[in-house]
Amino acid sequence: MYSTRFRRGLSYVPRRYNPRNYGFKRTFVVKRGDAKRRQTQVKKLTEDVKMSSQRIHENQYGPEFVMAHNTAISTFINYPQLCKTQPNRSRSYIKLKSLHFKGTLKIERVGSEVNMAGLNPKIEGVFTVVLVVDRKPHLNPTGNLLQFDELFGARIHSLGNLAVTPALKERFYILHVLKRVISVEKDSMMLDLEGSTCLSSRRYNCWSTFKDLDPSSCNGVYDNISKNAILVYYCWMSDAMSKASTFVSFDLDYFG
């Protein structure tokens, strides 16, 4: 007769230790994937921490925010990290409440351009700041953010009413547009930039989620955001040889 020791539910003999069986089980657990265990570890680190209303501050300035005439640049708003030091987040998601920005724009003449009367012509142009929500964030095939022309059709469209191209309307929507029409005879001038917009209201909540694949990547950069990233586009359109430089501070109010 066969022993009932290996038949489920029929044996009352205590199971003896078998090194081969236990070693096999350990190998099986590892093969199920380290990613799930890392995500579980990330979740356990913060599951006991309460969510709270906070604000994260960011300054955008420097050489990468200097534009020649008839050019545009694209960037994004950094979100909080999953950590213990505020401003932070305690989950793999946050509620976006509102976004405020304030800063300065400097327009400068480049080179010596003289008109028929022997005078420097006016610097005339339009500077635009556009805030855009990216519902399904991912980099383009070249590893970069979507450029101004790709999203809005052409930079010259900033002179009128901007609209997302039809093919991208399901993924992107315009959150806020700020325009400054400039006409100056001097070689340089400075202007104030200021604006604010609400992302959540009593009728609608805007949530952003994060990939957080492992503890080392639980940051707030665009590549780790899986839903509702905020992109910022700056565009300077002018026929005059000139450049535009910005220093803009952003304050994001959120619950997380």
Curated annotation (Swiss-Prot):
Where is the protein situated, by its record's location annotation? Host nucleus; Host cytoplasm; Host cell membrane
- Motif range (Bipartite nuclear localization signal): 21-42
An annotated GO BP: DNA transport
Keyword Calcium listed? no
Region annotation Interaction with Arabidopsis thaliana NSI protein: where it falls in the sequence: 150-187
Molecular-function GO terms, alphabetical? single-stranded DNA binding; structural molecule activity
Keyword annotations from UniProtKB, A to Z: DNA-binding, Host cell membrane, Host cytoplasm, Host membrane, Host nucleus, Host-virus interaction, Membrane, Transport, Viral movement protein
InterPro entries, per the entry: Gemini_BR1 (IPR001530), GV_A/BR1_coat (IPR000263), Viral_coat (IPR029053)
Recorded topology in the membrane: Peripheral membrane protein
Q: Which GO terms describe its cellular component?
A: host cell; host cell cytoplasm; host cell nucleus; host cell plasma membrane; membrane; viral capsid
**Domain of life according to the entry:** Viruses
State whether keyword Metal-binding applies: no
One Pfam family per UniProt: Gemini_coat
Q: Where is this motif: Nuclear localization signal?
A: 81-96
Q: What functional role does this protein have? A: Binds to the genomic viral ssDNA, shuttles it into and out of the cell nucleus. Begomoviruses use 2 proteins to transport their DNA from cell to cell. The nuclear shuttle protein (NSP) shuttles it between nucleus and cytoplasm and the movement protein (MP) probably transports the DNA-NSP complex to the cell periphery and facilitates movement across the cell wall.
Assembly behavior? Binds to single-stranded and double-stranded viral DNA. Interacts with the host nuclear shuttle interacting (NSI) protein. This interaction may allow NSP to recruit NSI monomers to the viral genome and thus regulate nuclear export of viral genome by NSP.
The family annotation for this protein states:
Belongs to the begomovirus nuclear shuttle protein family.
Protein name, per record: Nuclear shuttle protein
Q: Which organism is it from?
A: Pepper huasteco yellow vein virus (PHYVV)
